[in-house]
Amino acid sequence: MGLLDSKLCMMILAVSVLIIDINFEARIGTFFDLRLRTSYFKKSSSPLLSHTDSEEDLNYLSKHEDKRPVAIVTGSYESAHTGHMMHIREMFEHTGYKIVTKNELSLDTKWDVMWHHEYSFTQEPFKTLIKNASPNQIVNHVPGSGFYTSKVQLATSDLSNGVPKAFQLPAEKSKLLEYAEKNPDVLWVQKDNTHRNIKIKSTNDMDLSKNNSFVQKFVDNPLLIDNKKFDIGIYTVVTSLLPLRVYIYDGDVLIRFCPEDYHPFDANNVDKYVVGDDYTPIWEINSLKKYFNTQKMSFKSTIDSYLGMQGMDTSKIWLQIRNIIGEVFRTQQTKMLMSLQNLKLNPQYFELSRFDFVVDDQLNVFLMEANMSPNLSSGHFKQNQILYEQVLMNIFSLTGISTPITKEADILFKSRTSEQNPLVNSRDINLPLKFCVENKCESCDEAPECQLCGHCMNTETRKILEQTFVENSNRKQMKRIQFDYENHHPLTKEDHLLTLWLSTKCQLDNTWC
């Protein structure tokens, strides 16, 4: 074979490789293929290919740019790649997001979801990014969440029940001393917002001048299992402040036991009565092993089964928990709305927290604290991973972080008129309310409730009902909290209208109840 024939064969072979490679990319279209494709160009010494290298690559890149939605996943004290944020990061990746960490973040970052461990409205660059955000973006904090996650605020919020009596210091020092003198048998613990160094003390041994702290009555008759005190963690999500919408994860709960036996009691040994980081997990409690380990029950079902066998009705516990959570948000709504008004937010917002409860031997429930950005790391107890992942999957669905359709389609459908949106149609939210059907709202000014009639509904009311409908469709195992509006009037007109609408929805379909 001559030299000319040899060069011709090499050119034909190179072109063949290019054609095969382009066809392969057309079928697959991944960034891995792009790297393969680029390597072919770089390795080729053929003059036939080299002059198109730059142009071809640029055209390919423009057509195959990374169009994944972007999630900012950050925590100030540790990397988002490990530890506390690991499962959160993984869940975003599982649902198709590109992750941006704090080191990669700038004011020019394009993003869809912001999940920051700390309160993001007061920290830069998060504060500016949120200020410039659009309604299609999602932030994992709500304005004013400190009014219920602050230990001091929560303990001294004067709830009607469910929180042990507490006195804020130093402002209520004299009231505390007066109460303690009249009730000498009461045990007390002093706490602050760090929730650290909790220990039973007499008022004489406390620093009653300490700012941002409080003294709280100790629940001295806790319900025990195998002589161990335990707490119950409820994962809670608020999705709206105006009107107020709050959900709890109803699929399971977190149960944690104290490291040491409660009796014989010793106030100097906090491991007997404080659930700390090194708690005893449920699968090590002898009386619960047959339910949790052998029968593979959930945390909640394990507790229900054991206490049920002891003749206890655990439905009382879960009802009290829902009522207490509802009262916390209802009583703090005014303060939170003031924060919302000051911030003037455009993006969607939600907040995950974990409410921790203890139960006494009479099945009375007491709220201990509400944790902002609760720990979802299974680094200490690997068995908790499935619970944390289920919580995240449910939250992602409820809040619209993950959807059954692409982000582009979601935005497209939402841009349509209400009559043309398959996600939530006007016929999904217009209900056969009696005052609408009986023509009592021919004039839309007859009563505020007339805004729920299809011909009277304004844009803002429609938006609220559409959001509520979509949440209910996507909530999976999240359960909406019912607020006590029988004994307390709804705070705002929006709350009143939503309550009336939800009541009618419940009558038509019990999945709304």
Curated annotation (Swiss-Prot):
Q: Which Enzyme Commission numbers does its entry carry?
A: 6.-.-.-
Q: Mind telling me which Gene3D superfamilies this protein's record contains? A: ATP-grasp fold, B domain
Q: Keywords of this protein's UniProt record, alphabetized?
A: ATP-binding, Ligase, Nucleotide-binding
Q: Where does ATP bind?
A: 216-219, 229, 231
Name any Gene Ontology BP term.
protein modification process
- On the tree of life, the source organism's domain of life is Eukaryota
Q: Which Pfam families match?
A: TTL
The UniProt function text for this chain reads: Probable polyglutamylase that forms polyglutamate side chains on tubulin. Probably acts when complexed with other proteins. Appears to be dispensable for polar spindle formation in dividing embryonic cells, for cilia-dependent osmotic avoidance and for male mating behavior. Regulates microtubule dynamics in uterine muscle cells.
Q: Which family does the similarity line name? A: Belongs to the tubulin--tyrosine ligase family.
Name used for this protein in its record: Probable tubulin polyglutamylase ttll-15
Q: What organism, scientifically named, is this protein from?
A: Caenorhabditis elegans
Q: Which gene encodes it?
A: ttll-15
